[in-house]
Swiss-Prot record:
Binds 2 Zn(2+) ions per monomer. This is Chaperone protein DnaJ. The J domain is necessary and sufficient to stimulate DnaK ATPase activity. Zinc center 1 plays an important role in the autonomous, DnaK-independent chaperone activity of DnaJ. Zinc center 2 is essential for interaction with DnaK and for DnaJ activity. It comes from Paraburkholderia phymatum (strain DSM 17167 / CIP 108236 / LMG 21445 / STM815) (Burkholderia phymatum). Zn(2+) 2 binds at residues 167, 170, 189, 192. Its cofactor is Zn(2+). Residues 5-70 form the J domain. A zinc finger (CR-type) spans 137-215. InterPro entries: DnaJ (IPR012724), DnaJ_C (IPR002939), DnaJ_domain (IPR001623), DnaJ_domain_CS (IPR018253), HSP40/DnaJ_pept-bd (IPR008971), HSP_DnaJ_Cys-rich_dom (IPR001305), HSP_DnaJ_Cys-rich_dom_sf (IPR036410), J_dom_sf (IPR036869). Transmembrane segments: none annotated. Keywords: Chaperone, Cytoplasm, DNA replication, Metal-binding, Repeat, Stress response, Zinc, Zinc-finger.
Length: 377
């Protein structure tokens, strides 16, 4: 099945800003999140589709590649794409893709002999946290796959008792020259991939890679106020460099789980608050939840369903904010159910008193009936 256009998935224009893309993704994620739609396969697919679209369009490099080449520009099976989930940009045998990914440590060889030095690939790790953890900060540990020097060949990639030999194609320079008419182009040696050597008898344990994978534990400090989609950089914990090049970095991408009570909008929080119709009619103090505990505020007499109250400073203090956002409480007036006969009689007496009183006890209803009457007159 062909993939839909990422902009179409999020419902934004191709020139949409980063904020517009983020807001569109947050809205779809809230709507289709599996926690809110248990057992709903369609919602799960929509959630995955929106997540994939956001991951591509929120990254400036991936977005540029997608804008120019479409899905082919970000297909993980083609030479321009990053990894899905957790993974590097080079495979287990240390294939080098050079400047396509910006991994050359010095921007090329500059005409010098000897093997090229490459920076290790960056890795990505996706982590889900709760809204409370995002608001207050969170220290945790993660276990990630990591490359280490092969214990059998000690990193040489060669079978014990043998050693790498000088590449016969480039004579150890790591590069070859290709002539095309009047032009001479230097490019990475196709046999040794720029290392200047080749391995006639690869190590059977690491298959000539000189490294093997193991799992290591890393400490991750999630700062208070982090938002969905933000990344935390762990320097030097990506894949090891090639030929002595520096290691890449590990990027921990944060995703915030849907909350049972609150919805986040930047530094602000929103919640739906049901109140009994008697409290709405008479007014009084109500108790509402916040991320810091419980808070109280007074609803005025005659509060209507849908009324929004703002509690200043009861939201989240963002990473770049000096003060916390606000909590918006959206009141929903509840109608009582399963009435007893005595309660029903009381309500009927109450309704009768409203009609006989002649006062405008229901201003919205009165206004609506007036408009309907004028429509038919």
């Amino acid at each position: 099945m062909a993939k839909r256009d990422y902009y179409q998935v999020l419902g934004v224009a191709k020139n949409a800003s980063d904020d517009e893309i983020k807001k569109a993704y947050r809205k779809l994620a809230m709507k289709h999140h599996p926690d809110r739609n248990p057992g709903n396969k369609d919602a799960e697919e929509h959630f995955k589709e929106a997540k994939e679209a956001y991951e591509m369009l929120s990254d400036s490099q991936k977005r540029a590649a997608y804008d120019q080449y479409g899905h082919a520009g970000v297909d993980p099976n083609m030479a321009g794409a990053g990894a899905q989930g957790f993974g590097g940009f080079a495979d287990a045998f240390g294939d080098i893709f050079g400047d396509i990914f910006g991994q050359a440590a010095a921007g090329g060889r500059g005409g010098r002999s000897g093997p090229q030095v490459y920076r290790g690939a960056d890795l990505r790790y996706s982590m889900e946290i709760t809204l409370e953890q995002a608001a207050h900060g969170y220290d945790t540990q993660i276990r990630v796959p990591s490359w280490v020097s092969c214990e059998i060949c000690h990193g040489s990639g060669a079978k014990p008792g043998t050693k790498p030999e000088t590449c016969p194609t480039c004579n150890g320079s790591g590069a070859v020259r290709m002539s095309q008419g009047f032009f001479s182009i230097q490019q990475t040696c196709p046999k040794c991939h720029g290392t200047g050597t080749y391995i006639p008898e690869p190590c059977t344990h690491c298959h000539g890679a000189g490294k093997t994978k193991e799992t290591k534990t890393l400490e991750v400090k999630i700062p208070a106020g982090i938002d969905d989609g933000m990344r935390i950089r762990s320097a030097g914990n990506g894949e090891p460099g090639i030929n002595g090049g520096p290691s890449g970095d590990l990027y921990v991408e944060i995703h915030i789980k849907a909350h049972a009570v609150f919805e986040r909008d930047g530094d602000d929080l929103h919640c739906q608050m049901p109140i009994p119709f008697t409290k709405a009619a008479l007014g009084g103090e109500i108790e509402v939840p916040t991320l810091a505990g419980r808070a109280t505020f007074t609803v005025p007499e005659g509060t209507q369903s849908g009324k929004t109250f703002r509690l200043r400073g009861k939201g989240i203090k963002g990473l770049r904010s000096s003060i916390a956002g606000d909590l918006y409480v959206h009141v929903q007036v509840e109608t009582p159910v399963k009435l007893t006969d005595a309660q029903r009689d009381l309500l009927q007496q109450f309704e009768k008193s409203l009609v006989e009183g002649g006062a405008r006890h229901s201003p919205q209803s009165k206004s609506w009936f007036d408009r309907v009457k004028s429509f038919f007159d």
